């Protein structure tokens, strides 16, 4: 259904928090993510004016984003809103407007363009989880973020090339 739309911007919450008057699409989770009163009013005014439309990405697009996020080690770093923004942009072949480095990283891997309010990423990074105690490496975050071998905290670090 959404595939026939022209190329457009898919907006993350940072756009509304910064008060950028812009046209594009966002997702239900981004709307839920906006908590402060001023940003909420601003977003509602853009929706009322028809400048911002709310759309939900397909399950297939969401599954693709989760797959790529698992490959990069960033799946636990993404919020539901981040995943939806990436999935909607993937589905629409649109451009993402976000300051989130994890979102930018995955967008780059998928060949999606992105815009930022601040400085964006310089290179794509793949991540892994490593125990700070014993150095054991994990592809996903262990339960509770704790190493099952030594009980130390597990941190996300960039993979070496």
UniProtKB/Swiss-Prot annotation:
Its cofactor is Mn(2+); Zn(2+). Changing residue 12 to N: No cleavage of pre-16S-rRNA. The keyword Acetylation does not apply. Keywords: Endonuclease, Hydrolase, Manganese, Metal-binding, Nuclease, Ribosome biogenesis, RNA-binding, rRNA-binding, Toxin-antitoxin system, Zinc. GO terms for cellular component: preribosome, small subunit precursor. Mn(2+) binds at residue 12. Zn(2+) binds at residues 131, 134, 147, 150. CDD domains: PIN_Nob1-like. InterPro entries: NOB1, PIN-like_dom_sf, PIN_dom, Ribonuclease_PIN, VapC_family. GO terms for molecular function: magnesium ion binding; RNA endonuclease activity; rRNA binding. Residues 120-125 are annotated as: Flexible linker. Changing residue 100 to N: Non-specific cleavage pre-16S-rRNA, maybe due to altered substrate-binding. Residues 126-161 are annotated as: Zinc ribbon. Residues 7-105 form the PINc domain. Its EC number is 3.1.-.-. GO terms for biological process: maturation of SSU-rRNA. Toxic component of a type II toxin-antitoxin (TA) system (Potential). Processes pre-16S-rRNA at its 3' end (the D-site) to yield the mature 3' end. Belongs to the PINc/VapC protein family. NCBIfam families: PRK12496.1-3. This is Endoribonuclease Nob1. It comes from Pyrococcus horikoshii (strain ATCC 700860 / DSM 12428 / JCM 9974 / NBRC 100139 / OT-3).
